[in-house]
Swiss-Prot record:
It comes from Prochlorococcus marinus (strain MIT 9313). It comes from the Bacteria. This is UDP-N-acetylmuramoylalanine--D-glutamate ligase. Pathway: Cell wall biogenesis; peptidoglycan biosynthesis. One of its GO terms (molecular function) is UDP-N-acetylmuramoylalanine-D-glutamate ligase activity. ATP binds at G117, T118, N119, G120, K121, T122, T123. GO terms for biological process: cell division; cell wall organization; peptidoglycan biosynthetic process; regulation of cell shape. It is found in: Cytoplasm. Its EC number is 6.3.2.9. The lineage of its organism: Bacteria, Bacillati, Cyanobacteriota, Cyanophyceae, Synechococcales.
Amino acid sequence: MARTVVVGLGRSGIGAARLLQAEGHQVTVLERSIEPHLQSLAADLRLQGIAVELGKPLELNSFIPLLDQLDAVVISPGIAWDHPTLTALRQRGIDIDGEMAVAWRSLSHLPWIAITGTNGKTTVTHLLNHVLESNGLRAPMGGNVGHAAAEVALKWRQPNAQRPDWLVMELSSYQIEAAPEIAPRMGIWTNLTPDHLERHGTLDAYRTIKRGLLERSEIRIFNGDDPDLRSQRSSWDKGLWVSSEGPGTANHRADFWIDAEGLVREPQGALFAASALAMPGQHNLQNLLLVTAAARQTGLPAKAIEASLRSFPGVPHRLEQLGHIQQMSVYNDSKATNYDAACVGLKAVPPPAVVLAGGQTKQGDASGWLKQLDQNACAVILFGAGASELQELIKTSGFSGELHCCSNLNAAVTLAIPLGVERQAACLLLSPACASFDQYQDFEARGEHFRSLISSHLTA
């Protein structure tokens, strides 16, 4: 019997293996590591009838014993689509899929709302899920946030499972690239700035991947405030455009916008006050409009959307306000994993700020972030693997505030608190501008560590 190999015992790999096994496939999971927590996960999967082999790197030799019966290989988003081993397997006639493609084949009969973009997509995903479910619609979310898409599909297969009205799926460029068949009912594109260039090579290649998802979407929703998306507007024959900067010009009219009085509008009239969403920053006004546009396409009335916006609790690790230390507001923006996201977050908080930044650096244009640091930060404390590189970058920019380097986040927080009090900073902001993988499993783990370090110091 043909066998499918799933590579990796991460969230998406486990989801794909379980879904494929439930659909009747013979499944083997290959995992390069042998760490104790993975041995426990492997034992659980074996009890479900799924074969697992640990200590198997992504090399052709790991697949040789299975080649005679191998039908397909499913990879996680963290594996490059053009990895040499995958190329060698394709040359042998073996299909390569991403976990998202496996989920799509199981869920394609349901209407998807797919959210992509460099930044903002997680907030939009959470907010849209909240708006839809607050109004009685079944709209589970997953993909790049929350549950793996395959786990969402598994839940739908359970006896007596209620059919979802919508599936709210966040898709990264990695997931889109490995699932080119996904064709959502609705696609939302939040923005595009240089990111993941170490994976995709060029901004054009990165843009093309995300554009493909929107081209396959029946309803397309775009952030017209984003310079890159706006520059591409004439290339789209249809779509809904939103703008937090007004109705636009005759040639670039917005379909949803915020007027001079702070009201959210559509061509038929005013809907509600933009202040219904209590999240700081211009970027969150854009997120509000994207969600409003999508919610209106599902048929929700303005009053229902407004009430849901007012009850939204926010998203962990995205400008999450943790409390105060004396006069300082404390924000956890661990999700700011690139320069553009960090710049947006810094614009949204009250100055002057003590900024904690660092981790695994990425390619990208740091000029906007450096300018914002000089305008809004009285001190920057760097930590992690990229601290020295960032220190040189910030020094070269002529930053006028205090600049310190620490080995890790513990030391950075220990230094930041008294420094912020002394400098009478308005806020203490974790905004790394870097990936987390030098010292953490993911940005969530980094944010949770920051929360634990800061909790005993909070005064309100």
